[in-house]
Amino acid sequence: MERLLIVNADDFGLSKGQNYGIIEACRNGIVTSTTALVNGQAIDHAVQLSRDEPSLAIGMHFVLTMGKPLTAMPGLTRDGVLGKWIWQLAEEGALPLEEITQELASQYLRFIELFGRKPTHLDSHHHVHMFPQIFPIVAKFAAEEGIALRIDRQPLSNDGDLPANLRSSQGFSSAFYGEEISETLFLQVLDDSSHRGERSLEVMCHPAFVDNTIRQSAYCFPRLTELDVLTSASLKYAIAERGYLLGSYHDV
């Protein structure tokens, strides 16, 4: 049985090292898709690199936890910037949902201005779109715009609440992450998906070359290990041997 595998590299536009790593993993590896942070410090560099890599599908990485928002968000920013305090606000039931709705629309329009086309799909930095309060907003927006959405079904209480015309992969995994990155881990993710009977799977990854920005991240040197694994010829062979076809959200 042939299955669709989407290997999506998050954080396009975060830094030049991140951008170069994603392009390398696409050009010489198995990365087929990426998602861009339109408020990232290296987003213009990402746009420039993407012009020479037309095979790379590009979605939007909705940002509510880093940098400056595109709209006024007094309910979510501190000193004009976004941060991880969004988790505390969510726990307190204090998320400014109208501000988030407006920021989503603004980031989407900015993506189109930058790349000259709609994103292939939506996901988010630090998975904030899967917050129970935020997910309905993002799901409705994606369905209305006719674009796919990354869905981690584990936190969802009921798939039946999804808009009927919303597109996504049947499976999603964030397990290819951490200090124990290897080909074995990647293939285990595929085997687990196969055992669940999923016909399509997105695997999240973060390949990068280390630069000063990446050094400041809590997740730094494993990004280099990811790059090594994702550009392995033996991994590409093993994926094909398992009956997976590399693709993107265009194919969902």
From Swiss-Prot:
Pathway noted in the entry: Glycan degradation; chitin degradation
One Gene Ontology cellular component annotation held by this UniProt entry: cytoplasm
Keyword set, alphabetical order: Carbohydrate metabolism, Chitin degradation, Cytoplasm, Hydrolase, Magnesium, Metal-binding, Polysaccharide degradation
Keyword Lipoprotein in record: no
EC main group: hydrolase
InterPro entries listed in its UniProt record: COD_ChbG_bac (IPR022948), Glyco_hydro/deAcase_b/a-brl (IPR011330), YdjC-like (IPR006879)
Cofactor: Mg(2+)
GO biological process, one term: chitin catabolic process
Statement: the UniProt record of this protein carries the keyword tRNA-binding: no
Subcellular locations according to the entry: Cytoplasm
Catalytic activity entry: N,N'-diacetylchitobiose + H2O = N-acetyl-beta-D-glucosaminyl-(1->4)-D-glucosamine + acetate; diacetylchitobiose-6'-phosphate + H2O = N'-monoacetylchitobiose-6'-phosphate + acetate
Subunit and interaction comment: Homodimer.
NCBIfam families: PRK02134.1
Biological role stated in the UniProt entry: Involved in the degradation of chitin. ChbG is essential for growth on the acetylated chitooligosaccharides chitobiose and chitotriose but is dispensable for growth on cellobiose and chitosan dimer, the deacetylated form of chitobiose. Deacetylation of chitobiose-6-P and chitotriose-6-P is necessary for both the activation of the chb promoter by the regulatory protein ChbR and the hydrolysis of phosphorylated beta-glucosides by the phospho-beta-glucosidase ChbF.
Name the UniProt record assigns to this protein: Chitooligosaccharide deacetylase
Organism: Escherichia coli O1:K1 / APEC
Gene of this entry: chbG
